[in-house]
Amino acid sequence: ALVKETRILKKKVYGQQMVGESPAIQEIRSMIDKVAPTDARVLIQGSNGTGKELVARNLHQASNRSAMPYIEVNCAAIPSELIESELFGHEKGSFTSAIKQHKGKFEQADGGTLFLDEIGDMSLAAQAKVLRVLQGKKLSRVGSDKDINVDVRVLAATNKNLKEEIARGTFREDLYHRLSVIVIKVPSLD
């Protein structure tokens, strides 16, 4: 009963539905219905303000992980020197301002979904570490050599053309292939 009530409350909080009846929106809804029950990684592409975050939330809410955490990270908003600590956590004393142990976003999302928004803005070094977690399903916090297993479905979004970024050498091709198991393109609003 408590689980059911939690789901109902989460739907009220997260319950933003995609509006519109255009063929493009209907196709996105159809993709969400097909993809949500799987654990496949999804890359959501579209211009700023098109609703990529809404697509990610709807994927999580319709998934088998909907009762588990949904954690969002805006990769563009976190300075490159902090992204590793933010995503993977850190141990007390691992750097000057690490006054206590901190669980990263991957650990916080364990069992649920991690949404990496604006992944195209992530540094190559951070991309390599994300790739390692996706491949091995484990991470180690900054300042630790202990592996922590994580079970996380990763959704990512970008407003950039990642194939062009790969050609420029600013995005890892292997990470692109890991993230783009399924690609959902969100049309611009014009």
Identify the function of each model-found stretch:
Residues 1-2:
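Receiver (REC) domain switch/output surface
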Residues 13, 181-184:
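Short, solvent-exposed beta-strand edge segments and adjacent coil->beta transition regions
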Residues 57, 178, 182:
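ABC-type ATPase nucleotide-binding domain
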Residues 168-171:
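Charged helix-capping and loop-helix junction motifs
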